[in-house]
């Protein structure tokens, strides 16, 4: 393809819209109990798997932004082990926060991709330690306090991060 021929990197956000639909939180017990529309991990992992097949077929260089699932780390590791020219990052908050923060409809924890499970958090940290994840990003998306006042599912996703990322 064109990108492979000119040596550019394609930056990808991996989320299958048919699976994510109108979801706003990780598919889990808390979201289920609160009745919030969910985004299963499969929305990310299926998108990554599909992109990796295209990357393998075309030879393009690609960067996956904002990983949130432990299973995504495994897919990227397999791709790198196969010699595919892929890199990835994780948002800082995915390394420190989990879906537990949405308990009580805490809209300050409304981010996209959503905060995932404790297990996902640990696998993301492990992927970073092992060099599968190449870098940490801020995903700095501050919003006014009024943007977080509506019912959880109606609030905008976003979190401030730059002020805690830079010393």
PLM segments and residue spans:
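Histidine/acidic residue-rich metal-binding segments in metalloenzymes
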Residues: 1-136
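Generic intrinsically disordered, low-complexity segments enriched for polar/acidic and small residues
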Residues: 10, 149, 159-162
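Gly/Ser/Thr-rich active-site loops/lids in small-molecule metabolic enzymes
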Residues: 44, 154-167
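Active-site anion/phosphate-binding pocket segments in diverse small-molecule metabolic enzymes
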Residues: 138-145, 161-167
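Basic, amphipathic juxtamembrane/active-site segments
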Residues: 146-155
């Amino acid at each position: 393809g064109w990108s492979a021929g000119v040596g550019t990197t394609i930056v990808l956000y991996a989320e299958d819209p048919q699976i994510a639909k109108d979801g706003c939180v990780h598919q889990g017990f808390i979201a289920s109990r609160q009745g919030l529309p969910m985004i299963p991990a499969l929305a990310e992992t299926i998108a990554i798997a599909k992109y990796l097949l295209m990357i393998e077929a075309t030879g393009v260089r690609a960067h996956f932004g904002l990983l949130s699932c432990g299973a995504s780390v495994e897919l990227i590791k397999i791709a790198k082990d196969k010699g595919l020219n892929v890199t990835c990052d994780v948002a800082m908050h995915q390394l420190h926060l989990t879906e537990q923060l949405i308990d009580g409809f805490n809209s300050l924890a409304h981010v996209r991709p959503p905060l995932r499970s404790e297990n996902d958090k640990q696998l993301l940290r492990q992927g970073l330690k092992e060099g599968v994840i190449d870098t940490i990003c801020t995903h700095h998306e501050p919003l006014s306090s009024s943007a977080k006042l509506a019912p959880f599912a109606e609030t905008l996703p976003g979190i401030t991060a730059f002020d805690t990322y830079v010393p």
